[in-house]
A protein has these predicted regions:
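Soluble FAD-dependent oxygen oxidases
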Residues: 1-138
């Protein structure tokens, strides 16, 4: 049986949002789209700025375009001190990338700004050391 937006649509939507016990899927078909260079990476802030950084993240991410993924997190800075970070991946037109992330670069006093052009695969591998194979995080 095939389920899609147009064929067996009720089953398709049930599988999409029905949780882990709705049925057994034996194969998937994906439509892939090429992704060139993206603008990605983290900007780290001192942990003492966590409240302000989270409020900034809340406001910034709500107004961000669909081409920008933005995540807030807590973790160690390269020197070992506790920090908060905004991790971003901008996949839109390259000429608009810097303009889109400018508010992040202008916010607060970053400990480190590692936002840079990279491949989408590099963005996907950014947290590999923190989530090793076998933990089933995806």
């Amino acid at each position: 049986m095939t389920a899609s937006e147009t064929q067996n649509a009720d089953l398709f939507w049930g599988l999409r949002g029905g949780g882990g016990n709705f049925g057994i899927v034996t194969s998937f078909e994906y439509r892939l789209h090429p992704v060139g260079q993206v603008l990605g990476g983290p900007v780290l802030y001192p942990f003492s700025a966590a409240k302000d950084a989270f409020e900034f993240y809340r406001d910034f991410s709500q107004a961000a375009p669909d081409e920008l993924f933005c995540e807030f997190g807590v973790g160690p800075a390269p020197d070992g001190q506790r920090a908060v970070f905004l991790f971003m991946c901008y996949t839109g037109p390259p000429d608009l990338g810097e303009k889109t992330i400018a508010p992040v670069r202008e916010f607060g006093r970053p400990l480190q700004d590692m936002l840079q052009p990279m491949t989408y695969c590099e963005v996907q591998r950014a947290f590999d050391a923190d989530f090793p194979f076998g933990l089933k995080n995806y």
